[in-house]
Regions:
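C-terminal cap of metal-dependent C-N hydrolases
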Residues: 24-25, 382-436
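Alpha-helical scaffold segments that flank or form the walls of functional sites
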Residues: 88-158, 182-195
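Metal-coordinating catalytic core of metallo-dependent amide/deamination hydrolases
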Residues: 144-274
Length: 436
């Protein structure tokens, strides 16, 4: 008998290993139309075909029967702003005006700990109800915003990485701090929360225009003090932003050079957007082991530009998918992948379903340097997964019924699917959400 606590039966799809090309992704794709997943202590013991796994079932334990559903590794969102949840879908501005008009006033509310807790609870529920089990999250500059989010994620034993925004210029006075204050508050939060449960801390300078040299030096010191933390910031999202960086940092030839000068590139650094990078910047990301977060709904909504998917493969840069709520228009990774496909089509790049779901699962985990812990159904991985009902609307039932293989089904899910298709979400081996 296998020493397991829970067994789950259903159809399973994952990418069994990391890949360096889209063809390698396709070669590592694994599909079981009737499989059995064995779990113990929040970890995966084995995924076996039903015919093989049935022999290991304990007669008194049985199994969770999810036949008719498709089980995928939990989605990984590599860039999202939880304080912006309430302002999703704000009309009419591009990046810099959008920050001033909408974002900064909304973020000011998170000085109130009770308000932060209310939004944190709503935000985490949105993540899990959309099948996202791991996220890299921006908070606000208020420590209370970080405390609220980590407290809620800890309650569910989620794998979540987040950090207090750091910014000391070109923001309203009510959101401005000194470099010293930012350093001390961030240091205290790291000591309190980093590696507590499944949580991780991300040092979070908002972006170069809201950072003085002194602030980036403080970030550099924190990186040296706490080398196993993450770093997240924004990079080359908008042409006007890039011109502003050039004006503020004329001594640096390129936007990424500002971060690289302060040693903020590296294996646990994730740069959101990267739409307008040149080849030298792509090469720097590769050489330093840095990652990028591709945020298609946000890039389209703000009119920022089209991310170059092939450049990630060409330069061998790790990449994950980001919803980027609230400039992003959905928490749904299914809908986000559909928009990613359209971004590719506009550049004559065909994003296959296998590649898309790789970026949303194991590829995203790899961008966060978590590929040894999450991202597929390999033995020893943490048991984070999402249960998909592939046909919840009349149109989906018609279309899915005419699919010839799992790849066509996955493509239909990323073009017609949304949160209605999320039947259950499991975190660390426990069901934490299901449809009413």
């Amino acid at each position: 008998m296998m020493d397991y606590q829970t067994a789950v039966r259903g159809a399973f799809f994952d990418i069994a290993g990391v890949a360096e090309t889209p063809d390698e992704v396709a070669a590592q794709a694994r599909y079981l139309d009737d499989g059995l997943l064995f779990l113990r202590d929040g970890k995966i013991i084995a995924l076996l075909p039903w015919q093989e796994g049935e022999a290991f079932l304990h007669p008194l334990k049985g199994y969770v029967d999810l036949r008719g559903k498709l089980l995928l590794p939990g989605f990984v969102d590599t860039h999202i702003h939880y304080p912006q949840t309430e302002m999703i879908g704000a009309f009419g501005e591009q990046l810099l005006e959008w920050l001033t008009t909408y974002t900064f006033p909304v973020e000011s509310q998170f000085a109130d700990a009770e308000y932060a807790q209310e939004i944190a609870q709503f935000f985490v529920n949105q993540l899990i109800s959309h099948g996202t089990t791991t996220a890299l999250v921006f908070c606000t500059l208020h420590p209370a915003s970080v405390e609220a989010l980590f407290s809620e994620a800890l309650r569910l034993n989620m794998r979540l990485i987040a950090g207090k925004v750091m910014m000391d210029r070109h923001v309203p006075d009510y959101l401005c701090e000194t470099a010293g204050e930012s350093y001390e508050q961030t240091r205290a939060l790291i000591r309190r929360w980093h590696q507590r449960g499944r949580l991780g801390y991300a040092i979070t300078p908002r972006f170069a225009p809201t950072s003085t040299p002194g602030l980036l030096e403080a970030v550099q010191r924190l990186r040296a003090e706490f080398p196993d933390t993450w770093l997240q910031t924004h990079l080359s999202e908008n042409r006007e932003e890039i011109a502003w960086v050039k004006q503020l940092w004329p001594e640096h030839a390129r936007y990424l050079d500002v971060y690289h000068h302060y040693q903020l590139t590296g294996e646990r650094s994730v740069f959101a957007h990267g739409i307008h990078l040149d080849d030298a910047e792509w090469q720097c990301l590769h050489d330093t082991g840095s990652a990028v977060a591709f945020c298609p709904t946000s890039n389209l909504f703000l009119g920022s530009g089209l991310f170059r998917l092939p450049a990630c493969w060409q330069h061998q840069v790790r990449m994950g998918i980001g919803s980027d709520v609230g400039a992003g228009t959905t928490f749904s990774m299914l809908r986000t992948l559909g928009e990613a496909y359209k971004v590719g089509q506009l550049q004559s790049y065909r994003l296959r379903a296998s590649e898309a779901f790789y970026h949303a699962t194991l590829g995203g985990a790899r961008a966060l340097r978590l590929e040894e812990k999450i991202g597929n159904f390999q033995p020893g991985k943490e048991a984070d997964f999402v249960v998909i009902d592939p046909a919840v609307t009349p149109l989906q039932r018609l279309r899915i019924g005419r699919c010839h293989d799992i790849y066509e089904q996955l493509f239909v899910l990323m073009t017609l699917g949304d949160e209605r298709n999320i039947s259950e979400t499991w975190v660390n081996g426990e069901r934490v959400w299901c449809q009413d």
